[in-house]
Design a protein with these regions (language model features):
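N-terminal signal-anchor/start-transfer transmembrane helix
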Residues: 1-24
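Hydrophobic H-region at the start of alpha-helical membrane spans
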Residues: 2-5, 31-32, 122-129
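Transmembrane alpha-helical segments of multi-pass membrane proteins
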Residues: 27-41, 62-75, 114-123
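Membrane-helix interface motif
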Residues: 41-58, 86-95, 140-142
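Short alpha-helical packing/oligomerization segments
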Residues: 58-100
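Juxtamembrane inter-helical linkers in multi-pass membrane proteins
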Residues: 93-113
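Loop-to-transmembrane boundary segments
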Residues: 107-133
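Juxtamembrane boundary at the C-terminal end of a transmembrane helix
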Residues: 130-142
Length: 142
């Protein structure tokens, strides 16, 4: 239960920190963090396996579960942020397209998007946050 809440709060903080548009450098670091999670899960698994062999405090099946759950939880945190950032990136790409190729309607779309986009972003973050509760419940408590 404690680990479930820790990952849930980490996910909420990471989703709601306000950094929803990434630069090229941030995208590169974000992609490297996915690779880092995979490598970290493998290292954690080997470390846990060696710990069980030297000092048998948990069973092998529990060690396998912990390795899977920790890796899946970190991947889920990154995937939730990826969803939000991709929605913002797609929307800004649509607006750039309209500014360049649909300039006669861009002003109307721009004023409309300035009115609705903050509330739609909050709605998207709420939906993704509710989905993350279900994901972490499935990983840690089910």
């Amino acid at each position: 239960m404690d680990v479930f809440l820790i990952f849930l709060f980490v996910n909420f903080y990471y989703l709601w920190n306000g950094k929803d548009n990434f630069s090229k450098k941030t995208w590169l670091l974000f992609g490297l963090s996915f690779i880092g999670v995979i490598v970290g899960a493998i290292i954690f698994g080997f470390a846990l396996k060696n710990l069980v062999l030297v000092w048998p405090v948990i069973t092998i099946s529990t060690a396998k579960f912990l390795t899977m759950a920790v890796g899946a939880s970190f991947t889920a945190v990154l995937a939730m942020k990826f969803l939000i950032v991709m929605l913002c990136t797609m929307f800004s790409g649509f607006m750039r397209f309209h500014k360049k190729y649909n300039s006669e309607n861009y002003q109307a779309l721009s004023s409309l998007s300035k009115g609705f986009s903050p509330s739609l972003l909050i709605l998207a973050k709420c939906v993704v946050s509710c989905g993350s509760v279900l994901i972490f419940y499935g990983i840690w408590l089910a």
